[in-house]
């Protein structure tokens, strides 16, 4: 079950592969995400050494958040993955020109996980072509519904 989706990623990129990664979060962030107060539309994943980090993910603190904790809504958050998976991603990102984008946040065994996609950027004409295809599929379904 998805908590937050990044539909813009599917519009802007061709998603080749998806991976699941854990997130290093603070307590107030977990509560805010459970309340649906997170945004990953402008977020992206970077590599620093042998580690993955997510930047641009905005988590708005709840009103009930502690006053003793300084809440930074757009801080850099570390992603947790197996070393072999990270090594494979590093190779593809550095050599093949791929980029990493967060696709959604979801629960897995009670923990909040992020699905990240190995993606290539779409050109403007690719976006138009995808839109035409979507429209044609919708029209085709409508025509089939009318005839039967």
UniProtKB/Swiss-Prot annotation:
One Gene Ontology cellular component: cytosol
Ranges of compositional bias, category Basic and acidic residues: 127-142
Coiled coil stretches, renumbered: none
Compartments (UniProt record): Cytoplasm
GO BP annotation list: trans-translation
NCBIfam families for the chain: PRK05422.1, smpB
Name by which UniProt lists this protein: SsrA-binding protein
Source organism of this protein record: Aromatoleum aromaticum (strain DSM 19018 / LMG 30748 / EbN1)
